[in-house]
């Protein structure tokens, strides 16, 4: 029984790692090649295109200048579409409140539903006037975009194209 549980946990963690490793991986501060500042406004990013070289480790300094909660998330289009269901659930559970994030409720609900923790290394969720950072190693040339998956924002084209040079 113990072996069965171990294998189940091992295989499920392998699947999770593989699902994100195909887009890159969390970078190390000591390996940062460049810093890119990202400004989030209500339903758009500046810059709206990001040029990357395969193998680069980028430190993204992200600030939300908008009046709403926004997310900066590095992923494929398909991953964004899947993540949007989690973000909708966060709104339905009143974790996302337009211009606020209820961190206490997030923490409580995440005890039974880990997807509500929003603890992804490729993403940051910010209230207005807040800042965050992501250090990301682009070790693949998979077609990526940075987007906000707060309900309605992706549909409003809050997307930054990631180009590989």
Give short role names for the model-derived ranges.
Residues 60-62:
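Aromatic/hydrophobic beta-strand junction motif of beta-rich domains
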Residues 26-57, 115:
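N-terminal edge beta-strand
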Residues 18-25, 44, 65-69, 98-110, ...:
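Extracellular/periplasmic metallocenter environments
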Residues 84-88:
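Outer-membrane beta-barrel and related beta-rich outer-membrane complex signature
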Residues 71-75:
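Beta-strand signatures of extracellular beta-sandwich domains
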Residues 32-36, 54-58, 68-70, 130-132, ...:
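Envelope-exposed proteins and targeting segments
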Residues 4-13:
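Sec-dependent N-terminal signal peptides
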Residues 76-82, 163-165:
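Short edge-strand/loop segments of extracellular domains
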């Amino acid at each position: 029984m113990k072996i069965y549980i171990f294998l189940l946990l091992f295989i499920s963690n392998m699947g999770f790692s593989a699902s994100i490793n195909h887009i890159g991986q969390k970078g190390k501060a000591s390996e940062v090649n460049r810093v890119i500042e990202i400004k989030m406004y209500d339903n758009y990013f500046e810059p709206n295109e990001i040029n990357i070289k395969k193998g680069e480790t980028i430190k993204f300094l992200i600030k939300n200048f908008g009046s709403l909660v926004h997310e900066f998330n590095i992923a494929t289009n398909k991953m964004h579409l899947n993540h949007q269901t989690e973000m909708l659930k966060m709104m339905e559970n009143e974790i996302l409140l337009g211009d606020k994030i209820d961190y206490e409720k997030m923490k409580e609900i995440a005890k039974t539903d880990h997807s509500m923790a929003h603890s992804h290394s490729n993403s940051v969720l910010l209230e207005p006037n807040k800042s965050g950072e992501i250090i990301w190693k682009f070790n693949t040339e998979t077609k990526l975009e940075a987007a906000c998956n707060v309900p309605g924002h992706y549909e409003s084209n809050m997307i930054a194209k990631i180009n590989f040079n």
